[in-house]
């Protein structure tokens, strides 16, 4: 038999297999991030991977709609794989309106996007995130941004910056320039400002008819500044917006130092459901974008008919793992028990069960390898102790335990290990 052709042995394009060392690294990140969310009073939630397509497309925007894994099931229903967790959570809240608010939920879940795979980016990937639902307070904004920073630090990000904006500020700027009708083109351009040269970004804005001088004004205004400087900029654009932003900055500064945060009007986020404060996190020497979020005060009304303010963030887990250098975690076997003959098997199994009850990982040799092969095998898989049991050891009432790290060997009474 020739087996499967090579392309069928590999995962579907954009997907990945998780080998044990990689999966243990993922689980470590899951434990770290979940612990931070729990400490802030958030509780874990999960939803089905499959959603009605209409639910996913409700406020996604055409670019995201094009990335949805879409299909019809055997009953003819139009379905899709979730592309984030915010939309499914909004749907869950739509039939749980009696929950006490604010609701604080978090997740660590698989999501799917049919975009072009590239290094570090897959079509199936994990997101960690939080949603704070039922509060319009700037304290809620500050809490979620603080939680994002705490999550990055807990994950091992020693170098990071969180860039913050408010979509209403961009709209006020466009209004002052008489350019609100060009909003979509401007948002598209600003979303690419950190990735493309100045002329290309301005070209995207002017391609829809926006005058060049207005495009240049928008580009130059959308520059990085401190949060304190941003308060004054926003006050000049709109007094009420500036005062609201000043409160947000005050509450954030009360919780964390502000040097990790910058105001950047080019941060608009690609999803169409954001309505206010938006932010993105960049990590490491290459400032890898690992996640972001913002306020989406209109989204829940689309599903429930009730206006409920909300905000949250999502982190691309694999991107964060790459940024902090967490690619694999070795988990060596604690004990490998080798027996020289069948008479020792029942003693080996009894010892293995005893050690497992104590929390150790234990393997008993299946009788297909000689001692030389076993030595090679246990070193390759990573093992701390090799236990040897044979007729001579049983006659003496002992087992031999070889420490494969320190390269020492001792005899230990079998009764002491079993008691």
Curated annotation (Swiss-Prot):
Name of the protein this chain belongs to: Histidine--tRNA ligase
Cellular compartment(s): Cytoplasm
Source superkingdom: Archaea
Keyword set, alphabetical order: Aminoacyl-tRNA synthetase, ATP-binding, Cytoplasm, Ligase, Nucleotide-binding, Protein biosynthesis
InterPro entries the record matches: aa-tRNA-synth_II, aa-tRNA-synth_II/BPL/LPL, Anticodon-bd, Anticodon-bd_dom_sf, His-tRNA-ligase, HisRS-like_core, HisRS/HisZ, HisZ
Enzyme Commission (EC) number: 6.1.1.21
Molecular functions per Gene Ontology: ATP binding; histidine-tRNA ligase activity
One Gene Ontology cellular component annotation held by this UniProt entry: cytoplasm
Pfam families the record matches: HGTP_anticodon, tRNA-synt_His
Family of the protein in this entry: Belongs to the class-II aminoacyl-tRNA synthetase family.
Gene Ontology biological process terms, A to Z: histidyl-tRNA aminoacylation; L-histidine biosynthetic process
């Amino acid at each position: 038999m020739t087996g499967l052709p090579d392309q069928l042995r590999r995962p579907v394009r954009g997907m990945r297999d998780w080998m044990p060392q990689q999966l243990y690294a993922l689980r470590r990140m899951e434990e770290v991030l979940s612990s931070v969310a729990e400490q802030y009073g958030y509780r874990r939630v999960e939803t089905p991977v499959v959603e009605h397509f209409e639910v996913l497309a409700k406020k996604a925007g055409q670019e995201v709609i094009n990335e949805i894994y879409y299909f019809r099931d055997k009953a003819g229903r139009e379905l899709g794989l979730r592309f984030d967790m915010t939309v499914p959570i909004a749907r869950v809240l739509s039939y749980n309106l009696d929950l006490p608010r604010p609701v604080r939920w978090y997740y660590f879940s698989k999501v799917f996007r049919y975009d072009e795979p590239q290094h570090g980016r897959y079509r199936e990937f994990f997101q960690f995130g939080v949603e704070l639902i039922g509060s319009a307070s700037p304290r809620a904004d500050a809490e979620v941004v603080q939680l994002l920073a705490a999550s990055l630090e807990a994950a091992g990000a020693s170098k990071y910056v969180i860039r913050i904006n408010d979509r209403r500020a961009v709209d006020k700027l466009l209004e002052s320039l008489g350019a609100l009708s060009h909003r979509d083109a401007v948002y598209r351009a600003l979303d690419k400002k950190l990735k493309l040269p100045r002329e290309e970004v301005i070209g995207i804005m002017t391609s829809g008819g926006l005058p060049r001088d207005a495009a240049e004004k928008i580009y130059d205004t959308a520059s990085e500044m401190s949060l304190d400087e941003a308060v004054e900029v926003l006050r000049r654009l709109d007094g009420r917006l500036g005062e609201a932003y000043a409160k947000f900055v005050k509450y954030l500064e009360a919780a964390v130092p502000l040097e990790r945060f910058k105001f950047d009007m080019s941060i608009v986020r690609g999803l169409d459901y954001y309505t206010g404060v938006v932010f993105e996190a960049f990590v490491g020497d290459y400032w890898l974008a690992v996640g972001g979020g913002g306020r989406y005060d209109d989204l829940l009304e689309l599903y429930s008919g009730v206006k409920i303010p909300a905000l949250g963030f999502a982190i691309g887990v694999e991107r964060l793992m790459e940024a902090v250098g967490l690619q694999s975690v070795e988990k060596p076997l604690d004990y490998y028990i080798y027996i020289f003959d069948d008479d020792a098997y029942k003693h080996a199994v009894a010892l293995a069960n005893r050690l497992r009850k104590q929390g150790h990982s234990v393997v008993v040799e299946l009788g297909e390898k000689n001692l030389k092969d076993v030595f090679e095998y246990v070193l390759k898989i990573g093992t701390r102790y090799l236990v040897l049991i044979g007729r001579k050891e049983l006659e003496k009432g002992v087992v031999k335990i070889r420490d494969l790290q320190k390269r020492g060997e001792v005899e230990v009474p079998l009764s002491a290990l079993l008691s």
